[in-house]
Regions:
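Short, extreme N-terminal leader segments that mark the start of a protein/domain
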Residues: 1-72
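Aromatic- and glycine-enriched beta-alpha-beta binding-site module
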Residues: 63-125
Length: 125
């Protein structure tokens, strides 16, 4: 018997867990000093609102397909990010897209048929 297909997680995310006060009431956040999750990522999604700031540091390209998505290009070869070194440090001061800044948090539906979104996080980070 076949199982239901597993939903694909968004870029960077290994797992998503809903944040709740009972289990995570004592959690604290800290600034991420290691951008190792970016090392092998050559393109990152952008919003239109970010174009002015992002274009100062990155070329902006659009994905192909039925619903093109704006991307900031962080490297010319797939799997190579020229802005992040092997230790996960950003090489120079550049604009960091909102998609990266929000990680490890994300608003997500807990059920496909749900209308409301829950604040989730990647517990592997």
């Amino acid at each position: 018997m076949a199982s239901a297909p597993q939903p694909t997680l968004p870029l960077f995310y290994n797992d998503l867990m809903p944040l709740n006060s009972r289990d995570h009431g004592k959690f604290r956040t800290k600034q991420i000093d290691d951008a190792g999750f970016l090392k092998n990522q050559h393109a990152v999604p952008l919003t239109v609102d970010e174009f002015v700031q992002a274009q100062r540091n990155f070329p902006i390209v659009f994905s192909s397909g039925d619903q093109p998505l704006p991307l900031c290009l962080m490297g010319l070869n797939e799997g190579v990010n020229t802005y992040v070194d092997d230790q996960g440090k950003v090489n120079e001061p550049v604009y960091i897209p909102a998609y990266i800044r929000r990680y490890p948090f994300m608003l997500a539906k807990l059920r496909p048929d749900a209308d409301e979104l829950s604040l989730c996080f990647d517990p592997t980070q």
